[in-house]
Amino acid sequence: MPLGHIMRLDLEKIALEYIVPCLHEVGFCYLDNFLGEVVGDCVLERVKQLHYNGALRDGQLAGPRAGVSKRHLRGDQITWIGGNEEGCEAINFLLSLIDRLVLYCGSRLGKYYVKERSKAMVACYPGNGTGYVRHVDNPNGDGRCITCIYYLNKNWDAKLHGGVLRIFPEGKSFVADVEPIFDRLLFFWSDRRNPHEVQPSYATRYAMTVWYFDAEERAEAKKKFRNLTRKTESALAKD
């Protein structure tokens, strides 16, 4: 049986028998050893190159403080990658696999109809106790419905290095602590069901995040943004 066919069957099985049930039951799930060490290493090396070459910039806050850099609230440095850039072949392969997993989830994601996603956000917490305070990725209906994070940290020891992603599932009596270990892929709902935080990191911590958009909510969010832009421009023109 061709390797591609085996991979397709494996991804479809993972999507339908693991990701979909977990998202509906607890709101999140993760897969370990997703790419394997060889391909995972290629992704890690490219991310390190981006970091060392100065491509990363301070992450910005969303919501009322949009566009503001507050290092005590959000301490990561980021850049955005489409996957087609030179030297990003391994990243592109990773993104294609995540795309296929989400595609196989299909109509089983409840009300959501996924047609597009963001670019990949490559993030580095440089240590020194940097983290990201409790927040919701999509608190106000911007279209994001699924958050996917791929971790790249070898020999990570949360007791020494911190950097745990703590999820506070809405309506649940527990919190979920996800250690950012190498080759782990995490999925969770992007809306208010999953407030989360990145606890202080005391070693360099790499991750790559993509967000998948619900088509209807995304279109409505873009419409609201266009209307707001027109109103703002009109108000400025009157001044």
Swiss-Prot record:
It is an enzyme of class 1 (oxidoreductase). Residues 116-214 form the Fe2OG dioxygenase domain. Disulfide bonds: none annotated. It holds the Pfam family 2OG-FeII_Oxy_3. Binds 1 Fe(2+) ion per subunit. Fe cation binds at residues 135, 137, 196. The keyword NAD does not apply. Residues 62-73 are annotated as: Beta(2)beta(3) 'finger-like' loop. It comes from the Eukaryota. One of its GO terms (molecular function) is L-ascorbic acid binding. Induction: Induced by hypoxia. Up-regulated in proliferating myoblasts induced to form differentiated myotubes. Residues 88-104 are annotated as: Required for interaction with ADRB2. 2-oxoglutarate binds at residue 205. The keyword Nucleus applies. InterPro entries: HIF_prolyl_hydroxylases (IPR051559), Oxoglu/Fe-dep_dioxygenase_dom (IPR005123), Pro_4_hyd_alph (IPR006620), Pro_4_hyd_alph_FE2OG_OXY (IPR044862). GO terms for biological process: apoptotic process; cellular response to leukemia inhibitory factor; DNA damage response; protein hydroxylation; regulation of cell population proliferation; regulation of neuron apoptotic process. Its cofactor is Fe(2+); L-ascorbate. Ubiquitinated by SIAH1 and/or SIAH2 in response to the unfolded protein response (UPR), leading to its degradation. Highly expressed in cardiac and smooth muscle. Also high expression in brain, skeletal muscle and kidney. Low levels in lung. It is found in: Nucleus; Cytoplasm. PROSITE patterns: FE2OG_OXY (PS51471). Keywords: Apoptosis, Cytoplasm, Dioxygenase, DNA damage, Iron, Metal-binding, Nucleus, Oxidoreductase, Ubl conjugation, Vitamin C. Its EC number is 1.14.11.-, 1.14.11.29. Its main location: nucleus. Interacts with ADRB2; the interaction hydroxylates ADRB2 facilitating its ubiquitination by the VHL-E3 ligase complex. Interacts with PKM; the interaction hydroxylates PKM in hypoxia. Interacts with WDR83; the interaction leads to almost complete elimination of HIF-mediated reporter activity. Interacts with BCL2 (via its BH4 domain); the interaction disrupts the BAX-BCL4 complex inhibiting the anti-apoptotic activity of BCL2. Interacts with LIMD1, WTIP and AJUBA. This is Prolyl hydroxylase EGLN3. It comes from Mus musculus (Mouse). The lineage of its organism: Eukaryota, Metazoa, Chordata, Craniata, Vertebrata.
